[in-house]
A protein has these predicted regions:
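N-terminal ligand-binding lobe of clamshell/alpha-beta domains
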Residues: 1-180
Length: 180
């Protein structure tokens, strides 16, 4: 992504610095999550859009798959082969029963909306992530952090630390963000 931007904006001399930082973060995360057995990897669900009338997620061919795999997790909706986001129903979410939910910045929904069943007629109370209060709103950086962009390395580090805090307890996200 960064290298593509460097072709569009060739006069920017920070491309190599950003690309190197991105690669270093990716390698750091991979090194720390590589030994997690497949059956012990967190199953995460991306709530891409959410309203009173529908919910959308990310299947195997969209950004959520990258984030899940890069952070050492499993995309709970990876069985969906559609490109981009796709409408899903609550029964599918119950069947997937994700251990963590990440709400993107493409929706105004907040974790409290799921904890309290405040939107639509959906009942989230039986979903593991809600039961254990592991629902997170994705941070907003230079742009919406769900999509690839300049914030990608910091977003990956945030995902990894949020999903596996014990493996990344030495990482200070505030300092990493400032340094970046």
């Amino acid at each position: 992504w960064i290298l593509l931007l460097s072709e569009i904006f060739p006069d920017n001399d920070k491309t190599e610095v950003v690309a190197e930082y991105s690669n270093n973060i990716y390698e750091l995360v991979q090194e720390r999550v590589k030994d997690i057995p497949e059956k012990e990897r967190e199953r995460i669900f991306f709530l891409f859009k959410y309203s009173d009338t529908e919910m959308q997620t990310s299947g195997e061919n969209f950004f959520g798959q990258f984030w899940a795999e890069a952070a050492g997790a499993v995309n709970a909706a990876e069985e969906i082969k559609t490109d981009n986001q796709v409408v899903v129903n609550m029964e599918q979410v119950y069947a997937w029963n994700p251990s963590m939910i990440f709400i993107t910045n493409f929706t105004p929904a907040q974790p409290e909306d799921l904890y309290g069943n405040h939107m639509g007629s959906y009942d989230w109370s039986a979903v593991s992530a809600v039961e254990h209060e592991k629902v997170y709103k994705m941070p907003l950086g230079m742009y919406r952090s769900y999509t690839p962009g300049a914030d990608t390395p910091v977003t990956l580090l945030w995902f990894a630390k949020t999903i596996y805090p014990e493996l990344f307890e030495d990482i200070d996200m505030v300092q990493e963000t400032k340094d970046y």
